[in-house]
A protein has these predicted regions:
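N-terminal leader segment of winged-helix/HTH proteins
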Residues: 1-28, 75, 126, 134-135
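Short, locally clustered residues in the helix-turn-helix/winged-helix DNA-binding domain
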Residues: 11, 39-43, 104
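A structural signal for well-ordered alpha-helices, especially hydrophobic packing surfaces
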Residues: 14, 100, 136-140
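N-terminal helix-turn-helix DNA-binding core of bacterial DNA-binding proteins
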Residues: 19-61
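Charged, amphipathic alpha-helical coiled-coil/dimerization segments
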Residues: 69-130
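Exposed, interaction-prone assembly regions rather than primary DNA-binding/catalytic cores
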Residues: 122-146
Length: 146
């Protein structure tokens, strides 16, 4: 089935991509899960634990554990909401922002090197991105309807 091959094609690139990205993250003493959450905070700050767990489709306890490590490493700060004391806003510290910028550059170099070895056009990449965003939105809706 074409749909099965479609999904499998994305799953098969995930592990090899992680293997290439891990040395970059190890160089900066950060794990892949921490990087994904740090990147999420950088893109959506100020944000909350609930928003991160929704966008990343991860359980709140998993996100909480990862956030604790990022806080302990002085990469993010937590501020209480003035309206709701239970709500806490997460932002990058200057150290976290610096790490985000450095890792982004290193990861972009890796990604550009991989793309350069293919014959993928900018239009093909954009179309793939659009399709993946559509699928991601549907999957998130399905996951939150359970």
């Amino acid at each position: 089935m074409l749909s099965q091959e479609f999904f499998n094609s994305f799953i098969t690139i995930y592990r090899p991509y992680l293997k290439l990205a891990e040395p970059i993250l190890e160089k900066h003493n950060i794990y892949y899960g921490q990087w994904l959450i740090l990147r999420d905070i950088a893109e959506y700050q100020p944000t909350t634990l609930i928003e991160i767990s929704h966008r990343r489709a991860i359980e709140k306890p998993t996100a909480r554990k990862t956030l604790k490590a990022l806080i302990e490493n002085d990469l993010i700060t937590v501020e209480n909401s003035l309206e709701d004391k239970r709500q806490k806003f997460l932002t990058l510290t200057p150290k976290g922002h610096e790490l985000y910028e450095i890792v982004c550059l290193d990861v972009q170099k890796l990604q550009q090197a991989v793309v350069a070895k293919t014959n993928i056009s900018q239009d093909q990449m954009q179309e793939t991105i659009n399709v993946m965003k559509q699928i991601h939105e549907i999957l998130l809706k399905e996951a939150h309807n359970d």
